[in-house]
Amino acid sequence: MTARKTWIESLASVSLGIAVSMLLAPSISLAQDQPKSRKERAAEADAEAEAPKADYSKEFRKLAAPVQTAVNEKKWAEVLAALPQLEAIPNPTLDDKKAIATWRLQATQGVGDQEAFAAAIESFLAEGYADPENVGAMHRQLAAHYSAKKDNAKTLEHFQKFVEHTPDVQPDELETLGRLQLQAGMNAEACQTLGKAIDTVKGKGEKPKEMWYQLRDRCYIELKDDASRLANLEALVGEYPDKEYYSRVVAIYQAQTNDDRTVMLNAYRVAVSDPDGGLSTVGAYLNYADTALVAGSPGEAVRALERGMKDGVVPTAGTNQQTLNQAKAAVASDKKTLPGEAASAAKNAKGEVDVKVGLGFYSTGDFAKAAETIQRGIAKGGVARLDDANLLLGAALLELGKADEARAAFEAAKAAAPAGSPLGRIADLWLARAARGGTAPAAG
């Protein structure tokens, strides 16, 4: 975190400025007793001439000298005792009042009276005495004070002002504000604040915290904003692949597309083929298996069920085992017929036929033949869904370890898909997966 000079430290220099203005310099610094060169004296004279002159009243000057001495000697009780007389001066100037307020800040902090210190800070801010560079830090001090008192509203109020007045606010500080806003039910504001933290870190080429995405997910749930929630979850699973996050993404795709078979097959595929991903529920794995079987990809059903069983999500007994055995039998049958289907497809002018055969090879785990056949079909033309075909091609290429070619296929899928469409979004999930590297669990 960026080091910042504390505002309370700067009060010392303010207090010294008061002393100089009252011609009390001899009591301030032993360094001033040292002989100075003509050049140093000239520089000081120029600086003094350029500096704004403090406007202290005659009454203030008369009473302030002993108070300044007590300040210099850190006799804070004496300073506090002297302040009421100074505050009673008739018609005090603005500089009189600011000096008194400054001494009150120093003295209340010096004696350790936290309540009086906080009150002095609030008064100092309210009167506009704080230098602009100190306003944020003073609000942060107040936020810490009210946090200790468990006054959530005041904590949020002052931490918000700290952020607003701090040009170099850090991502962790934005997280704190986001948490306070979320606690206060300010979900829209919390989403925005946490998004700023994420964008700030990404702008530096660094990886945002997983927790920031998780907190945003809570915000969007409260706001019932599924569109924004999906975008946040997609970014989360791209950075931190996990079966729970994939399952949330898949569930939203399912709801938004009314369980569209093409979309769901691709969504399940990217989740389960990711070694760091998977699905978190039995229902999701069974839906993947069913979708794959209907689509003519029994090998994906096998991989789905075996992954779910291996991860302890899908029970190994009962109908699940029966479905697995049936899918394995279908794969064995396909392996016998696919060579003939591939030869026939090669002679067909329609590329769509090649793509369907390519799905069969992908199903059986022959990823090289899958990639070859799909590429041939795309080159022929006449493919009904180029986005779907290129996603399948990219998946096969990624299994072969050809990451660069896979990325090109995913980019082609994204370009072919309508803007913002589910398959275009799934292409982005694949691209994130390809950027991380790694291979899928062993194919069945």
Residue ranges of model-derived segments:
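TPR-repeat structural position
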Residues: 76, 114, 152, 187-188, ...
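Solenoid-like repeat scaffolds
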Residues: 48-55, 87-94, 123-132, 160-168, ...
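Structural motif corresponding to the intra-repeat A-B loop/turn of tetratricopeptide repeats
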Residues: 73, 111, 149, 184, ...
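Residue at a conserved register position within TPR or TPR-like alpha-solenoid repeats
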Residues: 70, 104, 108, 139, ...
